[in-house]
Amino acid sequence: MIMMRRPPANLFMKEDLTMYKIQVYIPLESVDTIREVITKAGGGRIGNYAGCMSWWQVHSSWTSLPGAHPYDGAVGETTETDEYILQCRVDDAHLSDVLAAIREAHPYEEPVIDVVKLWK
């Protein structure tokens, strides 16, 4: 039998802040730009460390519908390409700034950004 216990309060953070995990899909050539804007906006901070992020390559597909202005592919076609998923943590004090920075720097017309509230 596996018993689950709540971890100590200071295991993940020293301050009493709500934390989020942000995950964003980006083209291969944009990873450095997005990492930079996230860090400058206050994301990826864990204790005395900044720029704490991970990313991995995935294969993605989509079909651009009429009215779209796709970064890659053409309207009415299904596009398949390699891209990165980048993820990091951000506290509630910086969440709005980080999301705005990603949207401003991201080359996609409709950036895919997932925000998940983490358990404290």
Placement of each model-derived feature along the sequence:
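Hydrophobic structural segments
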Residues: 1-120
